Amino acid sequence: MNTLIAITGLGIFCLLFEILNFRKGIVPFTILGLLGVLALNFYEFGTTASYYNNMITVSKFSTAFSSLFIILTIFLVALSHNFYENHQTKISDFIAIKVFLLAGAVAMVSFGNLAMFFLGIEILSIALYVLAASDRLNIKSNEAGMKYFLMGSFASGIILFGICLIYGAMGTFDIAEIHESSLSAELPIWFPIGMILMTIGMFFKIAAVPFHFWAPDVYEGSPALTTALMSTLAKVVAIATLFKLVSGLNLIPSLENQDLSNTFTNVILTISIASMTVGNIMALRQVNVKRMLAFSGISHAGFMLMTFLTIATSAGVLLYYTAAYALAGIAAFSVILYVCKNQDNEDITNFHGLGKTNPLLAAILTGSLLSMGGIPIFSGFFAKLFLFNQALHAGYVAIVIAAVINSIISVGYYFKLILAMYSKEPNEERTGKPFLIYAVAIISIGLNIALGLFPSLVLDLLN
């Protein structure tokens, strides 16, 4: 709760910086403020409490994921300094939106009431709609903002309809009361229907197949920094929230009918395999790097959904996987922001010869792509290893085989970009070494490797 209040206060201070004309100091001030919020969040780790009639609940799950969200936001704010250098008059607005977006993200994993859950989703979503369309003179950005707004509105409507059905079945929005009522023998049919509608709405948010069709166009059309935010922070928030929703509302045990329970498991299996396969196959044919990473994100959503098959014991694995994926994504987009800063697009041709003109950033991008592909020593490899091991122990052999095949396929399009950096001649000489871009890229890939070398640091937090 203190974390949420501190984040909201920091967002208000960011808006005041615009009024007081302190724009030059807003990025370092916000980073220092977020580091203070992170320390406060660490201090609360291990405590369990509820606030405002259980509207907000603090637990290890919420604190651990909130820490990850804060770290990712620090990186994104740091990247804003160079990205918005030509829009200095608006930089405080963009920074404040990111901080308020973080408040929505923390609320989404700290909810104890469905009203707070929906409020968190809307805070996050509205901030993303604005950021997607923030390049107002770019028609692709306008199109991305409109598409994202329409699809997000439909998803929010479906979620709200599900919440209404759950309220009709249980007579309360409180998660603890719903959980307790779901253990009873007599359970209204509206409850599983409402839960299924909420799950479908969240599948839109994480861009899982077949609810993924908005992602490639929105990722490609949005400003590169917004795409980085969507593919890392927003996706991780949505999958963590869905995990808490399904486990907190006791959906799977509440399906007393064995056929219903098996149906839910089969749906998760189908969507997981479909997301992995469609995402990887479509990524193979992409020449735009942002669009390629959009399909890669769809594929990773399929991998993350595998944790729902063993939901009682997989919170630690989900935290580890999301951390590994998000850190690799931040490192990759740091390099993309540097390479494509003055370009009209983010095509692979822009990366030709990067290994010769800037070996350090080429190595960082290579490392982040190898992590996403599941190559050791990066944490992406161990994330998939722990995920597959858990699924095998639960008896889900078929999905593990499909996941391994898809991991092999993904290496194909990652190496397409890697080969372009090292085997092609550079198109142009790039000058300048922006400190914050280099710092974010080095620290994020360093943290990714550290998680691979010491996985227990994250895995044991929620086990």
UniProtKB/Swiss-Prot annotation:
Record localization: Cell inner membrane
Signal peptide span: none
Keyword Transmembrane on entry: yes
UniProt entry keywords in alphabetical sequence: Cell inner membrane, Cell membrane, Membrane, NAD, Quinone, Translocase, Transmembrane, Transmembrane helix, Transport
EC number: 7.1.1.-
Transmembrane intervals: 2-22, 25-45, 61-81, 91-110, 114-133, 149-169, 189-209, 223-243, 264-284, 292-312, 317-337, 362-382, 395-415, 434-454
Catalytic reaction annotation: a quinone + NADH + 5 H(+)(in) = a quinol + NAD(+) + 4 H(+)(out)
Keyword NAD: yes
GO biological process, one term: ATP synthesis coupled electron transport
GO molecular function, one term: NADH:ubiquinone reductase (non-electrogenic) activity
Topological relation to the membrane, as annotated: Multi-pass membrane protein
Domain of life: Bacteria
Matches recorded under Pfam families: Proton_antipo_M
Top EC category: translocase
Entry GO CC: plasma membrane
Family of the protein in this entry: Belongs to the complex I subunit 2 family.
Its job: NDH-1 shuttles electrons from NADH, via FMN and iron-sulfur (Fe-S) centers, to quinones in the respiratory chain. The immediate electron acceptor for the enzyme in this species is believed to be a menaquinone. Couples the redox reaction to proton translocation (for every two electrons transferred, four hydrogen ions are translocated across the cytoplasmic membrane), and thus conserves the redox energy in a proton gradient.
Quaternary data: NDH-1 is composed of 14 different subunits. Subunits NuoA, H, J, K, L, M, N constitute the membrane sector of the complex.
Family annotation (HAMAP family): NDH1_NuoN_1
Official protein name in the record: NADH-quinone oxidoreductase subunit N
Taxonomy of the source species: Bacteria, Pseudomonadati, Bacteroidota, Flavobacteriia, Flavobacteriales
